[in-house]
């Protein structure tokens, strides 16, 4: 039997209660991850969020470098939840239940009482009966756990502080609710603190980074527009990424910068270091298991299989120039060139990424003239060209490769009018490309160890305390994979040797070399694609004023985050 009087004193529960006798026969042993706000550090919080992520997903489903959470269809109930046990300085403890299919909080246990958000459907209502089966009192709220409802009860997220202190207070509020010691508005705010500092931080490296900064400086502050729009857009971003064609979106997703200004995201590239986990939306098309050179085109009879769109994009490459059909003439064999990106609808810079792995402009195919290095790339009739000469793969690291030849698209010069060729892949800047409809470099600050910012200092680079809008801390991320100081976009972040410990410098972008091409990885590192080394704060000591390249080990001196 369940005692109901102490719960009904708030008028917060619904008539939807349930019995647990059947589930007590076989109690579920869900994984438990612990975190305490007592003496919490950046390191303890980072390890906690990493543990949450590792229990949420097996890593078996990874798309565009980003892990996908389990599909709820067919997921055994024994694998449906994980538990997060939180404690604070007051030695109060509560346990949150997270649904592994969306990383979201579904309920909470405090002592011998458990309470749950109102489920959206009967399936979820049945699933939560497997949680906290040994408590004496268990009830559901009359409200669900989505932000719209919680904000109606507790106020807008933009006015609710986050940080170690707010999490400490939230734990106490959740604990005392079980004894009628917490009012509903405070309870709703406390849930929003926990959800953002745990669920949203697990979903987004970006939000985890925001929380690390608050913990490091013992700061209490509300989330800015960049955080709130990411939270609101997680589902749409997950859908856009999973339904993208080789990383290009069928339609843009609008996000906001910290200052509230809006921008559109047209492709997955900038999101790889931002999103840690995606909600499952659809299964990859069966053809994605095959080489794009030989993949079959089959009807999609499975509604669960991702759409395979054919977006029309520009292809931006070296020095921010675009792939262009020379002279807007589409006769067979006309060379492809680099040219300043247009803003109109001229077809000679608009490329359709087709399901058959061709890249087409005005109905004709991007084609290699011969399968040997230094041969020109041309426009050609798709039906008369050799099939293998017209097929391309677009990798997440911004390589466009012709699978038949194993050669990659390249621009041997960064000047307008340069004719494009195929070359042996050395991951040079001259071989970096991004299919997108945003032709401008993405301007950002890059935050690293101790929440300090990467700063260009003449020909050197090191970490300094972050200063809002400081020009030396602004970086332009180019489509070709180069990272350039916003103050001087002719210079590039460069490693001029492929040796562990090499100091990274700011040098001319002219060589467009392998040492100037980088990739922001989903694990938080910035990888040099050619040598496999990552950016590293030497000895974890910013006072040395040296950023080096080093083999990956995953410590915080190798973790970087672009902030927008």
Swiss-Prot record:
Where do the 2-beta repeats start and stop?
489-528
Q: Which residues form the propeptide?
A: 291-302
Residues noted as binding AMP in the record, renumbered to the chain: 104-105, 145-147
Instruction: List residues of the Ricin B-type lectin domain.
Output: 309-436, 439-563
> SMART domains this protein is in?
RICIN
1-beta repeat feature ranges: 362-402
Q: Does the keyword Hydrolase apply?
A: yes
CDD domains per UniProt: beta-trefoil_Ricin-like_rpt1, beta-trefoil_Ricin_like_rpt2
| Catalytic residues in the record | 104, 147, 200, 203
List the record's Gene Ontology CC terms alphabetically.
endoplasmic reticulum
Indicate what this protein is called per its UniProt record: Agglutinin
This protein's species is Ricinus communis
Organism ancestry: Eukaryota, Viridiplantae, Streptophyta, Embryophyta, Tracheophyta
């Amino acid at each position: 039997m369940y005692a109901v009087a102490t719960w009904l004193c708030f008028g917060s529960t619904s008539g939807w209660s349930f019995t647990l006798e059947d589930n007590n026969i076989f109690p579920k042993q869900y994984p438990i991850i612990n975190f305490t706000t007592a003496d919490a550090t950046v390191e303890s919080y980072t390890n906690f969020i990493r543990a949450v992520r590792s229990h949420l997903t097996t890593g078996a489903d990874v798309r565009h470098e980003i892990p996908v959470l389990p599909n709820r269809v067919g997921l055994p109930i024994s694998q449906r939840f994980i538990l997060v046990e939180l404690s604070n300085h007051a030695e109060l403890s509560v346990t949150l239940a997270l649904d592994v299919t969306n990383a979201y909080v579904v309920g909470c246990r405090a002592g011998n009482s458990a309470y749950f958000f109102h489920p959206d459907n009967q399936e979820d209502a049945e699933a939560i009966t497997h949680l906290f089966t040994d408590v004496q009192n268990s009830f559901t709220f009359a409200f669900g756990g989505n932000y719209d409802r919680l904000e109606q009860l507790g106020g807008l997220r933009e006015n609710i502080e986050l940080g170690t202190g707010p999490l400490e207070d939230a734990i106490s509020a959740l604990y005392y609710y079980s004894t009628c010691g917490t009012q509903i508005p405070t309870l709703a705010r406390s849930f929003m603190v926990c959800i953002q500092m745990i669920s949203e931080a697990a979903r987004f490296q970006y939000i985890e980074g925001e929380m690390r900064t608050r913990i490091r400086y013992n700061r209490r502050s509300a989330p800015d527009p960049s955080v709130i729009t990411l939270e609101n857009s997680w589902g749409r971003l997950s859908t856009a990424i999973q339904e993208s064609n080789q990383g290009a979106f069928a339609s843009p997703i609008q996000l906001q910068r910290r200052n509230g200004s809006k921008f559109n995201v047209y492709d997955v590239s900038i999101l790889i270091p931002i999103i840690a986990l995606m909600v499952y939306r659809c299964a990859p098309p069966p053809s994605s298991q095959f080489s794009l050179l030989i993949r079959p085109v089959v009807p999609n009879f499975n509604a669960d299989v991702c759409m395979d769109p054919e977006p029309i994009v520009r292809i931006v490459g070296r020095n921010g120039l675009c792939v262009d059909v020379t002279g807007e003439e589409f006769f067979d064999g006309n060379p492809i060139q680099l040219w300043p990106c247009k803003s109109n609808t001229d077809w000679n810079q608009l490329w359709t990424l087709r399901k058959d792995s061709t890249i087409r402009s005005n109905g004709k195919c991007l084609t290699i003239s011969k399968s040997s290095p230094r041969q020109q790339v041309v426009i050609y009739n798709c039906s008369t060209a050799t099939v293998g000469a017209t097929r391309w793969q677009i990798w997440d690291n911004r390589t466009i490769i012709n699978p038949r030849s194993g050669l990659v698209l390249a621009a041997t010069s960064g000047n307008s009018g340069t004719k494009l060729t195929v070359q042996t892949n050395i991951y040079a800047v001259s071989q970096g490309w991004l299919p997108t409809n945003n032709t401008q470099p993405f301007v950002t600050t890059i935050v690293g160890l101790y929440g300090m910012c990467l700063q260009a200092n003449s020909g050197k680079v090191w970490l300094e305390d972050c200063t809002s809008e400081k020009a030396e801390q602004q970086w332009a991320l180019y489509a070709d994979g180069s990272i350039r100081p916003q103050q001087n976009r002719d210079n590039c972040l460069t490693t001029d040797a492929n040796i562990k410990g090499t100091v990274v410098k700011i040098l001319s972008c002219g060589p467009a070399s392998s040492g100037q091409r980088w990739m922001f990885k989903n694990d938080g590192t910035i990888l040099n694609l050619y040598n496999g080394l990552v950016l590293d704060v030497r000895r974890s000591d910013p006072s040395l004023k040296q950023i080096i390249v080093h083999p990956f080990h995953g410590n915080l001196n190798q973790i970087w985050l672009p902030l927008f």
